[in-house]
Amino acid sequence: VQALQPVGAMPLIPHVVELRFVLNQGMAFSLLSGKQLFLIVATSAALLLVAYWLFFRSRNNRLQQAALILVLGGGIGNLIDRVLNGEVVDYINLLFMRFAVFNFADICVCVGVALWVLVIFLEELHEDTKKGPKEQ
């Protein structure tokens, strides 16, 4: 990724996706840019909660565990960048739509959160079907 810095952008799939070196001092969409201490503390606290949920509350649900591992992995990756460099390197730029440049860790967090929401929804649906019409 550092090799992209002097180049600026390098097409990966023409007109679809390119690699573009961008330094992001904020979180998603550069929100809270320049608030490094807050972002480090808030991210660390959120990751501790996710780790707690993974190790003590996931009830042997493999899909939920996979979701939480994705969130942890992506969150830790971005946290390491932020602690060591004061910013996160983003490098994936989708050319077919107007969207922020992001990185692989962001993908892991987003997919993990979406999967976690799906697991919670499916668990609720399963609980409702177990109760039956009289208990609802």
Segments from the language model and where they lie:
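Alpha-helical transmembrane bundles and membrane-interface segments of multipass inner-membrane proteins
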Residues: 1-136
